[in-house]
């Protein structure tokens, strides 16, 4: 049921994908409040139907409480590993799985459009911008709990991965869009650290550079070309990835 942006790397650019996938994600989703499922989405069996009466003030408070830095328990039917085995595999084999809460950041959680009231449940269209590793299904589930009911996800579309939006993508079966260069890709998702030819050569030889930059991950450009991705800690570099060649 999920659609939207999927960033694919070709050749040596595949080594950069982890920096892209670690970027915040933006989604458009539909949440059905008043009904819960085994998987927290529409693909699972309905497990409860307590219903929910439209309450805009209560909804606003619940959404606000789930925005910012929160602790989230991933959906049990997920790819999270428990003692080396995916949680969804344990659930499907009949095990009861309890996953630990993990910190995530919800930068944006907004209800868009008008609610659709159908019987004893309400469908809400929402926009979510969240840190990598966030389960929007779990966010829907937790919204239901905060509203004193249950909820699950009925539609999900990823509209952006970091700065890469759905408008830059091609649908499967269509002519693909122009390939984005590795330099352009990493420069859009990471801050740039420009160094001289001599410093670039030192990095290639495995030397540590002392730089005037804050802690974080940077793409190193030498004469406008990406050479490496480095982590900077206390002004010192550590190579994460080198460009080929």
Regions found by a protein language model. Give the residues of each.
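RNA pseudouridine synthases
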Residues: 1-138, 142-167, 229
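Accessory RNA 3′-end/elbow-binding domains used by RNA modification enzymes
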Residues: 3-5, 23, 63, 145-245
